[in-house]
UniProtKB/Swiss-Prot annotation:
CDD domains xref list: STKc_HAL4_like
Location of this chain's protein in the cell: Mitochondrion
Covalent S-S links between cysteines: none
Catalytic residue positions: 256
The keyword Nucleotide-binding is assigned to this record: yes
Catalytic activity: L-seryl-[protein] + ATP = O-phospho-L-seryl-[protein] + ADP + H(+); L-threonyl-[protein] + ATP = O-phospho-L-threonyl-[protein] + ADP + H(+)
GO biological process, one term: meiotic cell cycle
Residue ranges occupied by any Protein kinase domain in the UniProt entry: 120-416
Underlying gene: ppk24
Main location: mitochondrion
Protein name: Serine/threonine-protein kinase ppk24, mitochondrial
Top-level taxonomy: Eukaryota, Fungi, Dikarya, Ascomycota, Taphrinomycotina
Keyword entries, A-Z: ATP-binding, Kinase, Meiosis, Mitochondrion, Nucleotide-binding, Serine/threonine-protein kinase, Transferase, Transit peptide
Residues that bind ATP: 126-134, 153
Length: 461
């Protein structure tokens, strides 16, 4: 049986509208176009060259479609100012020693919860992505003297191009503007941003986000090593649906849903992370003013069909397709298609069967599901998974985005409601301060040391 192999997917960011603009105007890629009036000193942390015109007063105002930062929009835009009203930040580090470092108040205004790398001790690097490196760090509680473990996502500066350095800043600001505002047990908690320099002139200067430490790695590894039982997979399915349904309720398009971006917490709960490509597309509860997104953003095998052939599309509906691919990989270990374009043999066959049986209306039809599983090798493993899971996956994999079911409706189905799920979690830690949150990885994880759950997804040591 022929199947598309399962492998790690890199994130791509191809903005079709930006490409079109750049072809018309070679100077269209600028800090001012992306951020509005942003102080040039802020970008010195990433060694980004800024032209003098960037910091001049202008009528350019940050818009939600430009960068998703609600805490900035509320503070600056509501008072009829553009980002930023502070025209010259001049971040200066003061004090006689490294332990007396202080930030310029104006930079603190942008990142009010910012801390310093000297608050943390670096232990080791555990992962490396396109724009960042994940490092395990510790913080010693000043009162109890206990070590607390965290994961620091360090955004690397690149020496290659202005565009890549600018993209790194975009990822950082997007993650910090979105992720800390989310309150859900299946969303990775960000503790604070952190400056990674002792001098503003330090060439290694930059920023990082201090997050929960998930010592068991990502979901990709568990799928790859084939250690998950059917019970585990069903539990994970429900947790994934809960996490993405929560994002949809908050009108946030993640745009890069994949196993690599789902971590396994110390208590065995899934933690969705990596919001560097995410966008806020509307206000919670408002179905009338949802803003469309553009470009092929995410990972190729998980991208919805509309990302390849439409200039603008609904990011929330595209996430539902990605969720379907993710669940298919979770249960079978194979991609259904290399990409959801007509040049892909199996996707083309999928579309042909759908047209013949349903007229491209619903992938819920039993006749369609029977035929695609029979005729498409990459979908044949679906015959061996629970009927409920199969129906969910195929219903989400509808080329017509308007006919993809909402995740709330899926969570409300009888089959999903009956699933045993690790949902008896506590969220008490989510509102505590940095000193109070304790993710201690100093001790080996054993089944006896864990808080009782319905399932134990931990790897035995």
């Amino acid at each position: 049986m022929t199947n598309y192999p399962f492998f790690r997917q890199g994130t791509i960011f191809v903005d079709n509208s930006a490409i079109q603009r750049n072809s018309e105007n070679k100077n269209s890629l600028s800090i001012e176009n992306i951020f509005g009036r942003f102080p040039k000193e802020f970008f010195q942390f990433f060694s980004i060259n800024v032209s003098k015109s960037t910091t001049k007063k202008s009528s350019v105002v940050i818009k939600p479609s430009t960068i998703t930062a609600p805490w900035l929009e509320n503070e600056y835009l509501d008072s009829n100012t553009s980002l930023l009203s502070v025209h010259s930040i001049q971040p200066s580090f003061i004090g006689m020693s490294d332990f007396a470092i202080g930030l310029d108040p104006s930079l603190k205004r942008i990142l009010p919860e910012i801390r310093f790398r000297l608050d943390f001790q670096h232990l080791k690097s555990i992962a490396k992505g396109a724009t960042s490196t994940i490092k395990v760090v510790t913080h010693r509680d000043k009162i109890t003297d206990a070590k607390i473990y965290y994961a620091a996502k360090v955004y690397r500066k690149t020496k290659t191009s202005h565009k890549k350095r600018l993209n790194t800043m975009v990822y950082f600001l997007r993650e910090w503007s979105i992720q800390p505002k989310l309150d859900h047990p299946n969303i990775l908690k960000v503790i604070c941003p952190c400056v990674t320099l002792t001098s503003v002139f330090n060439k290694s200067a930059g920023f990082c986000l201090v997050q929960e430490y998930c010592p068991q790695g990502d979901l990709f590894k568990q799928i790859e090593e084939k250690v998950l039982t059917l019970e585990d997979k069903c539990c994970y399915l429900k947790q994934i649906l809960q996490a993405v349904a929560y994002l949809q309720s908050q009108r946030i398009a993640h745009r890069d849903l994949k196993p690599e971006n789902i971590l396994i917490g110390r208590d065995g709960l899934l933690k969705l992370t990596d919001f560097g490509t995410s966008e806020i597309v509307g206000n919670p509860g408002d179905n009338e003013s949802i803003r469309f997104v553009s470009g092929a953003v995410g990972s190729l095998a998980y991208l919805a069909p509309e990302a390849f052939h439409e200039n603008e599309y609904c990011g929330l509906l595209a996430d539902r397709w990605s969720c379907g691919i993710l669940l298919k990989v979770l249960f079978t270990g194979y991609f259904p298609f290399k990409t959801s374009v007509k040049t892909d043999l199996y996707y083309s066959k999928y579309m042909s069967i759908l047209t013949d049986t349903c007229g491209i209306s619903s992938t819920d039809e039993s006749s369609f599901q029977t035929e695609v599983i029979k005729q498409i090798p990459t979908l044949q493993p679906l015959r061996y998974i629970p009927e409920g899971a199969k129906k969910i996956i195929l219903s989400l994999l509808n080329p017509d985005s308007q006919n993809r079911p909402s995740l709330d409706s899926i969570l409300g189905t009888a089959w999903v409601r009956k699933l045993d799920c690790c949902s008896n979690f506590s969220t008490d830690h989510e509102n505590k301060s940095l000193q109070e949150v304790d993710f201690d990885a100093s001790k080996p994880i054993t089944r006896k040391s864990l808080i009782p759950r319905i399932h134990n997804h931990q790897t035995l040591v």
